[in-house]
């Protein structure tokens, strides 16, 4: 019998979950054993999962889960260096040259574990079967707007908070923009899920948005147009061959650009298209000031959808559920492709 173990998230400001009570009910009905850990922060309460027929585990007890359990979470595990013996479904951030990713792969190798990276669950056409992209784009645009509004008032963006939904987030932004003009914004990757979410947020706030995608960046750069907007949102994942959108020279350039929202958030990747910063930012300090004359702030947070934890979890879980229903066949379909990706990278 397949045993799915849904762990509590241990990262600060992470309330999302990848399966809803309805999804658990579907797994239980299909004959799967499901354990859901208690969580002090999860946006969806344990009561719904219990009603769906799951077993309840102690918060953060996944290291002691049975050997055959498939441990399912979203964000990174504690960096304690211990070998990992289970099969893990999560966002590993381990295949694009990230230093922390190599550490994760080495821990899995040492313990005999396996990573089924959620970013690499793809169909036969190579497209991801589930993604938080829309919500990352929406929340990322909101944070960039907060950064710009703080600049306009002579400051820097303060700590972020979660919101009960898009309406609450937009109301918060509207209050911050009272008496302010609207900046010009450009999105690269505008046709994808992330870019669509970003554009929806900006449009809802009354901004004129320049939307670029592959056709507009095919020349390889340089891209002076990016520096001609007050806000730039990067919605393109770092990968080999990706052009540089903001070179290091932009720090000293004559530019309108004052806020970069790196929603893709791969600053430690060798292929990052933004060369003016080298580390992610956090909820408590969302803006990194990389230049002062003229000012330039970068915001790059890798769990943006947790600003809207319920909406983003429900949407993502619905996309992922058909694949979770095939966990009994880890040797086929999306799971086989994810395992091949893991095998290729762990062997390096």
Where are these regions (language model features)?
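Phosphate-coordination loops involved in phosphoryl transfer and adenosine-cofactor binding
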Residues: 1, 85, 181-184, 257
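An N-terminal-biased, well-structured beta-alpha scaffold segment characteristic
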Residues: 2-107
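Glycine-rich phosphate/diphosphate-binding loop of Rossmann-like nucleotide-binding domains
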Residues: 8-44, 154-236
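Phosphate/diphosphate ligand-binding glycine-rich loop within oxidoreductases
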Residues: 70-152
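Short glycine-/small-residue-rich Rossmann-like dinucleotide-binding loops
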Residues: 75-76, 92-93, 236-241, 264-265, ...
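Adenosine-phosphate binding glycine-rich loop
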Residues: 119-171, 265-348
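Rossmann-like adenosine-cofactor binding region
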Residues: 214-294
């Amino acid at each position: 019998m397949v045993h799915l173990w849904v762990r509590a998230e241990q990262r600060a400001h992470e309330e999302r979950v990848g399966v809803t009570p309805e999804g658990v009910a579907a797994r239980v009905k299909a004959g799967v054993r499901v354990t859901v850990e208690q969580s002090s922060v999860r946006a969806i309460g344990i009561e719904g999962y219990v009603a769906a027929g799951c077993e309840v585990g102690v918060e953060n007890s996944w290291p002691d889960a049975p050997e055959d359990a498939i441990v399912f979470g979203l964000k990174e595990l504690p960096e304690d260096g211990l070998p990992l013996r289970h099969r893990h479904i999560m966002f590993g951030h381990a295949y694009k040259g990230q230093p922390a990713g190599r550490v994760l792969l080495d821990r899995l190798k040492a313990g005999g574990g396996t990573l089924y990276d959620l970013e690499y669950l793809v169909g036969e056409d190579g497209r991801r079967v589930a993604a938080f992209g829309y919500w990352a784009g929406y929340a990322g645009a909101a944070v960039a707007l907060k950064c710009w509004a703080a600049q306009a008032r002579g400051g820097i963006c303060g700590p972020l908070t979660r919101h009960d939904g898009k309406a609450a987030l937009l109301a918060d932004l509207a209050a911050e923009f009272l008496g302010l003009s609207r900046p010009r914004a450009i999105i690269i990757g505008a046709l994808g899920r992330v870019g669509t979410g970003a554009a929806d947020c900006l449009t809802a706030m009354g901004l004129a948005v320049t939307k670029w995608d592959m056709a507009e960046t095919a020349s390889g750069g340089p891209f002076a147009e990016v520096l001609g907007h007050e806000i730039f949102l990067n919605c393109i994942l770092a990968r080999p061959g990706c052009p540089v959108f903001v070179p290091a020279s932009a720090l000293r350039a004559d530019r309108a650009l004052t806020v970069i929202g790196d929603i893709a958030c791969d600053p430690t990747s060798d292929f990052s298209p933004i060369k003016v910063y080298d580390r992610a930012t956090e909820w408590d300090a969302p803006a990194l000031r990389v230049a002062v004359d003229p000012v330039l702030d970068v915001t790059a947070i890798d769990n943006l959808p947790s600003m809207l934890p319920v909406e983003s979890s429900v949407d993502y879980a619905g996309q992922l559920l058909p694949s979770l229903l095939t966990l009994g066949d880890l040797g086929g379909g999306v799971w086989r492709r994810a395992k091949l990706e893991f095998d290729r990278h762990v062997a390096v």
